[in-house]
Every structure is written in C-alpha cells, then in structure tokens.
C-alpha cells in the first residue's frame, strides 16, 4: 500500500474525487454531475443510486488520472452535502425513498407545529439549531409519517437513517458499518451537541426510532474498510466531515476567532469559537466545527441557501449567460448609477432571517435595466447576505475585535470582481487561498493525519497559502447606503413583515 490519500467530496449537484500524494499535491481528479428532482413546489430530491454511482465513477476516474491502483491508497476521507436525508434497507442497502435534499422545504408545517407548541427553545438549547425544514430531523419525521409502512419497519430496525456520508460508508463497507461523524450528526436536529449523543427527548418529540440511527464517531476515526469487491482493495476510511466543517479544516481555521465562508450552491460562514459553545442571540446556529481526539470544537454558523445557485438561475432560467464563468464579465458592464437588488429567496431565506415562506424578488428596475444589471445584482446578493452573517457574528462573538479577516473558498471565489465587491460590502479583508478546493482538502487531511501520513494541525496550518488579499475600497457612505437598500429589499420579501 502506498502513501496516497483518496478524498471524496459528495456535493449537491456533483461528486468529485481527488488523489493526493504525501506532499499534499493533487495528482488525480474525477468529477461527475448528477440530476436533481423537483417533484413539487419547494421539494428537492436526489436519487441515492445516482449519488452512489457518481462516487464509484469519480473514484475510478481519479485513480486512472493519477495512474495508480486502489491498493496504493492508504486512506479515504469523505466530505458531503449536509442535512440531506437518506433512508435505506438495512439488509439490502437499497434506498427506500429518494434522498430529501437540504434545500427541501416540505417539512415547514412540521416546524411550524413544533414552534406553536413552544418547543423551539428546547431544540435550540440541545442542538444549537433552529426549527427549520433545512435540518434532517423534521425531514425524517415527514418521511416516517408520510411513507406507508416505513415507520413500522424503522421500529423493527429494518431501516437505516443517515446523512449522505453515512449512506456512502454503508455502501463502501459492504453494509458492515452504519456510522457517521460528529459534524454531520450535529446537523440533524436530534443530536445533543453538549452531551455529544443522540437525544432521547427530541427523538420522542419527533417520534423517531433510535434503532435507525448511526453510531457517531470523531471526524478522524476508524469508519471501516472498503469492500474489496468494489475497488479491488480494502482501504480504511479514516476521515469524515460535513462539507462546511471540512472547509473550516481545509482553511486551517483552527484558532478561536478564525472565520471561513464557502461559496458554492449556497454560502456558509463559520466562526471558530473554540471549546466554548456560544449561544447566538442573533439567529445564527451553534454547531460542531470538528471533534478530534474526543475534544469538541464549536462554531457559530450562518447559512445562506442561494449563492452560486443565483448564477445558475441567470444561466438556466433567464438565459443571460451560457456558462457560469461569464457572469463576472457581464456584471462589470452594469450601469454603476443603477442600484438593482436581487433577493434570491428562491427556497426561503436562511440566517439570520430563517423565513421558509419568503420568496425572491428584484427591486430597482428601470427601462435601462438589462442582463448586466441582473448579473451584478446576483453577485452582490452574495456579498449582502454575507454581510448579514458577519454582522450577526460580531454581535454574538465576544472575542470579535473588529479586525476579522475572512478566508474564502468554493467556485465563486475565483472571480476577482466578486471578491472585491465582497470586501467592499463587508468593510473587511477577504483572503483567497492558493488551493481553492479547501473542502476536499479538509477531508483529505482528516484521513491522512489519522493515517500518520500528513502533519499535525499546526504544521498543516503553516502550509496554508494565500493567493490574494482583497481589501475594502468603497466609501463608507456609499457602503451604508447600499446596505440600507439591501435591508429594505429583504424586508419587503419576508412573509411576516411590518406594514
């Protein structure tokens, strides 16, 4: 067995696998997209078999690209779209329903009922989360209540529940391991992040059988070995983390006060608060950043549902661009005198508003508004939403000194225009790393460090390199006016607003 690391990044619209060598260099890549399904308004589903096939295919592509065999891989690390809920038959490993994706809003009535019963403070205290259909627990309750015969099978222990990582590990190990890691468990709405255990009281409220839940491990742990029949070798799976927590690790945000923001389909900002669990008073989430050697590190998180998806909307629904990479050049052509705001509440609004019923809108249209102004508004909406998150974090985090530097990653950060606009709106420096795929790098480090191949946290942090720092360059009066316009626009989109 060689010293190579295989990392798998299973995302919302595609799966990517990478092979890293001992020096943390990428030597092989495989990527495949897979379809999403929208069976009803507000519903988003994946076929779990599509996910599984994309994982196997990208692994084989990455190995071929690297020119190595599976037997040369020392360890596997997995990172995944969080909250997406998968149910499968314990005996066959076959999914019993399409995966309900994190973006899916069908459980909104379940959340509203729990809120009416005054239960949100209890859930928040135990899990650090809010009652929103974004999280797995209410999706799971909906499935158990709605799919005929499912609850009876779950009670008998015949059905497994898991986030995507858990499903993949089950398949990769030939059904021998039903496990997950602490970061993914912390996003389910049924995991007590103080006790680091599934919470019986919350399970009882949601009527979820404990028999269907996976075992929860540290992020760097022994998750099992791959079935030799799949890849031709038994490879240990040694690292697992939800995608946003993996990006915290990949960005080397190991110290309290360090902050990262990932820009993919959505946008997710996490602020490391160390071993202190900070309870937000500004509608942020308290979550597990990572758990290593039995020690839990916490984070404040703000979740934005639509970031890169707004660019996809410009491309797919409006036809303003042919490929996503064209959007920055188009935005640069926008009339600077027009102030157009896009509130991309296509599936509701996330932090700090948490309004499942909010819907998107565009404000400030004139006869001269065209594709360029739409493009700029779409990119600026990401900056404004990030400002909302950073503003809330500064209010919650006692350690904030007003000198926050934001480390960024994800597909959107390749755009210099977007990153400069982000720095301008935040009035804070934005650091873009040399290696942009920090999510998959984080998964690779978890596995490689567990295998003893890559360095410890400190040495890994020293290895992090900045490509460019974007410093704010906007007049304060202009910035304040722009933010005021944004907040007025958001206020008009909220489902419950002052008239």
Curated annotation (Swiss-Prot):
Superkingdom in the source lineage: Bacteria
EC number assigned by the record: 2.7.1.30
Binding site for glycerol: 82-83, 134, 243-244
A single cellular component GO annotation: cytosol
Pathway(s) served: Polyol metabolism; glycerol degradation via glycerol kinase pathway; sn-glycerol 3-phosphate from glycerol: step 1/1
Inhibition and activation profile: Inhibited by fructose 1,6-bisphosphate (FBP).
Broad EC category: transferase
Keyword line: ATP-binding, Glycerol metabolism, Kinase, Nucleotide-binding, Transferase
Residues annotated for ATP binding in this entry: 12-14, 265, 308, 312, 411
CDD domains assigned: FGGY_EcGK_like
GO terms under biological process: glycerol catabolic process; glycerol metabolic process; glycerol-3-phosphate metabolic process
Catalytic activity as recorded in UniProt: glycerol + ATP = sn-glycerol 3-phosphate + ADP + H(+)
Binding site for sn-glycerol 3-phosphate: 12, 82-83, 134, 243
Free-text function comment from the UniProt entry: Key enzyme in the regulation of glycerol uptake and metabolism. Catalyzes the phosphorylation of glycerol to yield sn-glycerol 3-phosphate.
Family under the similarity heading: Belongs to the FGGY kinase family.
Protein name (database record): Glycerol kinase
